[in-house]
Amino acid sequence: MNNARPIRRALLSVSDKTGILEFAKSLHAQGVELLSTGGTARLLADNGVPVIEVSDHTGHPEIMDGRVKTLHPKVHGGILARRGIDELVMEQNNIKPIDLVAVNLYPFAETVAKEGCTLADAVENIDIGGPTMVRSTAKNHKDTTIIVNASDYDRVIVEMNANEGSTTLETRFDLAIAAFEHTAAYDGMIANYFGTQVPAHSKDECHHDSKFPRTYNTQLVKKQDLRYGENSHQTAAFYVDSPSFNGQGDEASVASAIQLQGKALSYNNIADTDSALECVKEFSEPACVIVKHANPCGVAIGSDLLDAYNRAFKTDPTSAFGGIIAFNGELDAATASAIVERQFVEVIIAPKVSQAARDIVAAKANLRLLECGEWNTKTTSLDYKRVNGGLLLQDRDQGMVGLDDVKVVSKRQPTAAEMKDLMFCWKVAKFVKSNAIVYAKDSMTIGVGAGQMSRVYSAKVAGIKAADEGLEVQDSVMASDAFFPFRDGIDAAAAAGISCIIQPGGSIRDEEIIAAADEHGMAMVFTGMRHFRH
């Protein structure tokens, strides 16, 4: 084949030595001459693989404690030489072609993540020769093969076996893309780290100043193309965090979930599933969250998942049609059967799905069934919000109050049952679009008022939703994601039958708001924490 390039000489120099010995043995078996450096060379030699030290190949020793090893014309000339063009120059300078380079870089991300890492530690783990070889080889992909991921070793060996020791241009180009992605991520990590440091009193040291660097670099990997975006006239794709760059690859999420069956996820499916899953993750007892247009329309805790689903559905059966359902436990056969017999649903997501449940859901071939895995801790990460010409970055809202954090500000103390419902209601309100009002009773939402421009209207909407579904508001509790600016919201809640309110507090009219609650005989609890969601 015209674009095939034989591999006769390879340079191997890796920090992560996973699979490198087996790869080197396979190359040697095909007659490939091996060059290497430092620890990689020692590993090969100790295991009987013939290897030439790069310093012997170049005729120049490693210097400056290994800082300069591969930065030499005999290395980069051998990599960058254009086959069929540069042979005379190579002969005049005694440069031998290097056909394959396998390199991965110093572990910068792991180093700076360690507690007590100093700037000096970070600097010594900035790879120079490695990225230079990677970029050189990727640039000359027409003639040379670059490998930066151990997962590609077998792929290259298989192709060489099938092509008389050669690689194809298609493979070399694909590997070159991976190489440039690799070096882009690496430099981005370094820029992010340095961008959060400020000089300290010592000229050789810095200290951490901010989690927000001067320039923000990240890397996302395309998971799938989507049929269209939020609307049919918009094109779209779904990108996920690169685990090597962002270190979040193992978090249970819609991004890491495995689709077990159903049609391809749409743009809106993904956004709504994220909202549902993140909400249900707040609960430790068996819980179900039903979401429509990014807002919870039904949330409940139950004795088991079936009970939780039945109660969540009861909140708003109308809105639940075509919704997204999330659970915080293994989806079982009884719950799956209840769902498919009762309603049309776009997506079901759970940490685990039993085989019996899978068999039942299979009757609805288009229903998207996702398994996201268990979650144990909350991962620290950032939220992004795109604005025209810029990007807003903030910590993810992982704040949540407990019983010991809230303050009763009314004359009447909430009962134990009311306080339990307040905690439940507050968790739900965190995931409702502002202005958010949630009515709840017995660990089940009664009405949800979302996205109204005034808080009092959100309260009215919650009441209307409850009335439309025949749910009794009397003696329910209410959560508000932000403070009440006026007493009208309290008056509306009292008129609807609300007995107790949880809200952040912090209004200049707090005294007036508390007085209104006392006037109506309501209990009121302040959290001191707001949960705006836009």
From Swiss-Prot:
Keyword Hydrolase: yes
Residues in coiled coil: none
Top-level division of the source organism's lineage: Bacteria
Domain MGS-like: 1-148
CDD domains for the chain: IMPCH (cd01421)
Catalytic activity: (6R)-10-formyltetrahydrofolate + 5-amino-1-(5-phospho-beta-D-ribosyl)imidazole-4-carboxamide = 5-formamido-1-(5-phospho-D-ribosyl)imidazole-4-carboxamide + (6S)-5,6,7,8-tetrahydrofolate; IMP + H2O = 5-formamido-1-(5-phospho-D-ribosyl)imidazole-4-carboxamide
MF annotations from Gene Ontology: IMP cyclohydrolase activity; phosphoribosylaminoimidazolecarboxamide formyltransferase activity
Functional pathway: Purine metabolism; IMP biosynthesis via de novo pathway; 5-formamido-1-(5-phospho-D-ribosyl)imidazole-4-carboxamide from 5-amino-1-(5-phospho-D-ribosyl)imidazole-4-carboxamide (10-formyl THF route): step 1/1; Purine metabolism; IMP biosynthesis via de novo pathway; IMP from 5-formamido-1-(5-phospho-D-ribosyl)imidazole-4-carboxamide: step 1/1
Name this protein carries in UniProt: Bifunctional purine biosynthesis protein PurH
UniProt organism field: Shewanella sediminis (strain HAW-EB3)
Gene that specifies this protein: purH
